[in-house]
Regions:
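P-loop NTPase nucleotide-binding/switch module
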Residues: 169-205, 209, 236-291
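Walker B catalytic acidic pair
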Residues: 296, 302-303, 314
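Walker A/P-loop
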Residues: 215-256, 321
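Basic, amphipathic alpha-helical bundle interface domains used for macromolecular binding and assembly
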Residues: 34-45, 60, 67-77, 285-286, ...
Length: 508
């Protein structure tokens, strides 16, 4: 007898439909699985055989053939266990064929017959709904995640026996599984930071145009404290962004027990010992890395020169393309990576250069330390700002600082200006303006062109860093509500670029 079961596999954050065929026929007793399978999928036949036995069902002494369609896609992971069980049970007549129509089945099984959770349930359920599937059988621990997709019936099962009961028309009782993750209460605020007004201004500019930011300064100046508060001035995620971000966390296995889509923008702060694989993603079964987990949020790299050079250099392409593309023998995995890079570093090993009274480093050691950050990576950072040691009067002052909500309101207005301007384009923010459109959206007067020509030569700018200055100036103009870029906007944008040139030039 023949049966067909619908399931899915994750590739990147996309779900690809897979169909599990089962055929039970007379012949030499054999359990065979074909269809471009990884070792863990091939091993599932032993789990299936034993789990069914421990559930009370002995497979007949017949030839059982399982085929996975399409054959050109490598099948990986343990989520195929439950669909194989369903296909076999249907083929031997334990469950009716009609019960599996328009139904997706996914889940791992233990030898006892219990159903275990799998990663990527959210994109799987969302994708099969678009294909007309009306119900899904998923592991009980994935219930809350699956139910985030509306207008599709979800059956969360804890065992093979429960799945058989449901497929044979039995009553389904919804479960209360664990405790849902509570919404995070925001405790950080820009009003916590005393002084550092130039730094806070740079943060607002960076967020307003979605520009990358580098803070350079001595230890204890507030670089990390400032970076941690940047997500509090970012606008809320829209519904599409919430779903996309939630899919990334679902695939990475960090989304279970949530009762709603992710609403807060992520803030990821990997340690400087992180590997390339941990940063950009990968692995035997590829998973998103830190740059994808920071999608639509902030990726904070503290002590930037302490990262391995080949690790941070790998950021260059994702920073431009806003996605990560991992090419493997069994396919290409694409993960979104549209983040704001916020980096912090000391200007030397001891941290106090150019204060020669405190700095203990030699000229050679300063040069070695500062040059761990390559020029191509610096060119991709729009704003560089010096974070000086805060004065005692500012630290101990009673002046009330501006709160995050006030700054965020201004940022939302600037974002609205950009989205309206670029509504017919395939980009939304000033930082994303392609080189071919710079002249159109960042137009300068004749005098401004002469000024920028002088700056271009003085600072020895590259074409990319020159364009970064113009994009930041465009953001400053939007913040002031002016249609044209003014001289003051260009001057401020040049200041943000001049700081990195000063540190790197002085180290030579």
């Amino acid at each position: 007898m023949y049966s067909l079961v619908t399931t899915s596999i994750i590739q990147g954050i996309k779900s690809i439909p897979v169909y599990v065929e089962a055929d039970v026929s007379d012949g030499m007793p054999l359990f065979e699985m074909v269809g471009s399978l990884s070792p863990e999928v091939k091993e599932s036949k032993e789990r299936v055989r034993t789990a069914l036995k421990n559930t009370g069902y002995i497979l007949p002494p017949k030839r059982i053939t399982i085929n996975f369609i399409p054959a050109n896609i490598r099948k990986t992971g343990s989520g195929f266990d439950l669909p194989v069980v369903a296909a076999v049970l249907c083929a031997i007549g334990i469950v009716p064929e009609e019960a599996l129509k328009n139904t997706m089945v996914v889940g791992e099984i233990s030898l006892s017959g219990d159903v275990k959770p799998v990663n990527g349930i959210l994109p799987m359920v969302a994708e099969v709904k678009e294909r007309g599937v009306t119900r899904c059988i998923v592991p009980a621990e994935n219930q809350t995640e699956a139910q985030l997709v509306k207008e599709i019936e979800i059956f969360a099962v804890q065992s093979i026996a429960e799945m058989i009961h449901i497929l044979n028309g039995g009553t389904y009782i919804e479960k209360e599984i664990g405790k849902a993750v509570e919404k995070t209460i925001r405790l950080l605020d820009f009003s916590d930071i005393q002084g550092q007004h130039f730094v806070k201004r740079a943060c607002e500019v960076a967020v307003s145009g979605m520009h990358n930011l580098l803070m350079i300064g001595p230890p204890g100046a507030g670089k990390t404290m400032t970076a941690m508060r940047i997500p509090t001035i970012l606008p809320p995620l829209d519904e599409k962004e919430q779903m996309e971000l939630s899919k990334i966390y679902s695939v990475s296995g960090q989304f279970q027990l949530r009762e709603q889509l992710m609403e807060e923008r992520p803030f990821r702060c990997p340690h400087h010992t992180i590997t390339m694989q941990g940063l950009v993603g990968g692995g035997l079964i590829p998973k998103p890395g830190e740059i994808s987990l920071a999608h639509k949020g902030v990726l904070f790299l503290d002590e930037l020169p302490e990262f391995k050079q080949n690790t941070i250099e790998i950021l260059r392409q994702p920073m431009e393309e806003k996605e990560v593309r991992l090419v493997r023998v069994n396919g290409t995995y694409e993960y979104p990576a549209d983040f704001i890079l916020v980096a912090a570093m000391n200007p030397c090993k001891c941290g106090y250069y150019p204060d020669m009274q405190k700095c203990r480093c030699t000229a050679a050691s300063i040069e070695r330390y500062i040059n761990r950050i390559s020029q191509p990576l610096l060119d991709r950072i729009d704003i560089c700002v010096e974070t000086p040691q805060i004065k005692f009067e500012e630290l101990n002052g009673t002046k009330k600082e501006e709160c995050s909500d006030t700054i965020r309101a201004r940022v939302i207005e600037v974002h609205a200006i950009q989205k309206k301007r670029y509504q017919k384009e395939d980009f939304q923010f000033n930082s994303q303006i392609p080189a071919a459109r710079i002249a159109e959206y960042c137009a300068l007067s004749k005098d401004q062109e002469k000024y920028m020509k002088k700056i271009y030569k003085q600072l020895n700018l590259t074409a990319r860093s020159y364009h970064k200055i113009l994009k930041v100036a465009r953001t400053l103009a939007d913040m002031d509500g002016t249609e044209n870029i003014l001289d003051a906007h260009l001057n401020e944008a040049v200041c943000y670029r001049n700081i990195d040139k000063r540190f790197w030039r002085d180290s030579l």
